[in-house]
């Protein structure tokens, strides 16, 4: 823009122009210092626009009417301060009762299964046609049902995510690598058929139950209700119940494990590949209560992760994946010195046990090798006899059995198990054997420990079908036959799934306030439920994050740097903790800074602790209103009323006939006394009735506006809405539903803007943090819907005005077209106070840029329409930088410990590709051919094999991997209403004015565009990956957060029969060696 001084200068002669140019050059970047944007003019524009837009928002939302109606009832309401400790104790009690019901259902299954097995006599010739979950309803080319594939009636059931199920019968899944008619499986399926009536009875007693099942130690999986299983594209169902966490956790006790891997020269080629896969399968069987390390040996010892020399680490998913990456780097050479490795393994287990950090329960050494030249009895005598508390599990790799006897003896002499793994296809089944050995003490003790898993995603649904987080309660099933008691035979594990949303139903969201929430963690500090848990990421379609089930509380409540809250909850304490928090909203782009009070206690009967967070201020208060049922029912009948679908006003799960009811329908039936079996929250319903009565007049108000066509002639305002603290909503459309610009708004798919189990709507939460009487304006960030950003949402909070306490009782708002909103802005910016009508400055001038930004720095209006929704710092970096320096805005650093970052990885066709059963089979076939050629022609093909099987393709593949990031958010300083500034750039001075829009969260920014100031970089909100150097990575690996061990431990039992150790057939030749532990015992007394 050209100012009056400049125009004056322009009229002078050539000499004056030259003098001015020389002066500008002398001043450097302090130029155009007289060219200021008039603050008074910008103030006028801001005032005009603010008044106009508030008038529209207040008028169409009906905010003043609603505030007036609540004010009229103010004398009839009681305001109470929420007692957080009493609240969390009551919620924990509710959850205990729910968990107890689920545990009892599982206990009934255990009793029925053990009784059925006790009565059954094994019949090797038993022929029994059972319902095979893969084959049911399948026909051959002649139209006849396949064997094991009889007709099995299936019908969609909304209680089971609308999957087709049979609620009268269970069916059986058998892993692809097992024979459907194996006598052991047929007998097991036959006697477990008696579980059907218990499944049905459990479901009748507790209709909120979902999947119930029995996972057999033989490998089959009986599931109720029956459902058809579909193979993958290769015709394979890789699911093996024995490899699931609920099975392993229930079957065994926590354990410390050292895995020894032979990497001597004889292990080259396929043997090393099988060894790696064996290690990987062992890692799959380890859970969060276990600890491990991997040591390779030849002439020397090599820790797979050198940083963890001489210690063990928790077997969480992150650590296991870290070790898997190192497995790919193993290579074979030299000779194997097993004695050194065994000495090291025993010392590591002993030293780690003394730290008190491990499982303090079972201990084991897993030995993976192609042979042993000695029995190393002196080492076992030194470290392990006579107690034999460290079990030895030996895995002989390859078909040769020359050194098998020594390995068998080691396992049998140390209460372990020996297996031989000849091909990749053998790995899974052989690895599983050790779990049944570790289960023996528990079986002999006959201790039916109840176990609960961490949260995981329902495997019956694809990730893009919806998020169903759940936990499983499971119990082991034992053989009760007296003759097998000392053998400790585990029959399997029974369990049932508990959706996390069931836990959330026990939580009265209306008592937690607008920003309040409940959360629960496991004994390891991992999140069971928390509104900030984000298990999925999007890349084309929704996918599970690799480590979603082991997100620690400290990774979402990261402001608690000393883990005070986390550690208190892990240790099952009851108490209170307070801290300032930075809660992100609106897809993480905005931040609310507040102080939270946390209340916590333990949940008895489960390894979980419960917490409640209440935000200070209005979040700590609750009020009770009172109206008659007749009044309330009348106003609930209005068609514009809806209730939060995910809130539990009435329990519609207790009786099947109630499942089809919406919460609003259930309340109406309950109040009318038509459904005496309905159980409802009387206190919440009373407040719903109150809100319905108080907000009822707004329906007529909106209707009158809609009928007056001249009021909204250009149809700029499209929707008016309100929500109350009880989850009650009212909506009014000023245009036809098909004409709405944003078709998703206030619909179930727009999770951010509706009441759900985790949070209040975004427009409600943001309005609550605004100054009472002002509106918060925002545009939705793009989420793939083309026209979604073409609207502006305005909302304001309604408060019960009281001298001391002012709880937010409701929020109202409107949604209008962005074009309508922007037109109002440009109209206001053309006004000026000049009497002659000639404005000194205008947003139409080429020398200025005008913006409308919100309190988080996002652009709502710009002359360049494509900048709408962008962060102001990316467009005007120099101005934003100056605003930060001046204190008009402040930068807040945030952290995301659940992020996914792009990483370049060398793709490999070696070990990981062999997880596929068919690839495993082909690899095994290739190995056999290689061995045959070696035998016939004595020609060394190892180098050919090795290069073909384990060489990595020389190409980089970009993948998304879990990472930690930090990123900024920006918040305006409320006390600063207006600011002017000049920025010294390289060859010019850039002036700007920022002016707050009255009664809003908006700011008008007018910037001198003639000075580009390109030397100042844009300010971006892009997250930056936090990269840890090697020493810090090592420290993070070693660091172990406080955890609580499971209360039960069954590490060993004196009556255990250790003779079944996988090597009984050849023990006779080694009787003398087997007597060594006994001799050692005698001499040690």
UniProtKB/Swiss-Prot annotation:
Mode of membrane association: Single-pass type I membrane protein
Main location, first listed in the record: membrane
Cytoplasmic-side positions: 1084-1085
Domain VWFA residues, every copy: 256-438
Entry keyword set: Calcium, Calcium channel, Calcium transport, Disulfide bond, Glycoprotein, Ion channel, Ion transport, Membrane, Metal-binding, Phosphoprotein, Signal, Transmembrane, Transmembrane helix, Transport, Voltage-gated channel
Matches recorded under InterPro entries: Ca_channel_alpha-2/delta (IPR051173), VDCC_a2/dsu (IPR013680), VWA_N (IPR013608), VWF_A (IPR002035), vWFA_dom_sf (IPR036465)
Gene Ontology annotations for the cellular component aspect, listed alphabetically: GABA-ergic synapse; presynaptic active zone membrane; voltage-gated calcium channel complex
Tissue: In heart, it is expressed in atrium but not in ventricle.
Residue numbers carrying Phosphotyrosine: 918
PANTHER family: VOLTAGE-DEPENDENT CALCIUM CHANNEL SUBUNIT ALPHA-2/DELTA-RELATED, VOLTAGE-DEPENDENT CALCIUM CHANNEL SUBUNIT ALPHA-2_DELTA-3
Note: In contrast to CACNA2D1 and CACNA2D2, it does not bind gabapentin, an antiepileptic drug.
Family that this chain belongs to: Belongs to the calcium channel subunit alpha-2/delta family.
Assembly, per entry: Dimer formed of alpha-2-2 and delta-2 chains; disulfide-linked. Voltage-dependent calcium channels are multisubunit complexes, consisting of alpha-1 (CACNA1), alpha-2 (CACNA2D), beta (CACNB) and delta (CACNA2D) subunits in a 1:1:1:1 ratio.
Protein name: Voltage-dependent calcium channel subunit alpha-2/delta-3
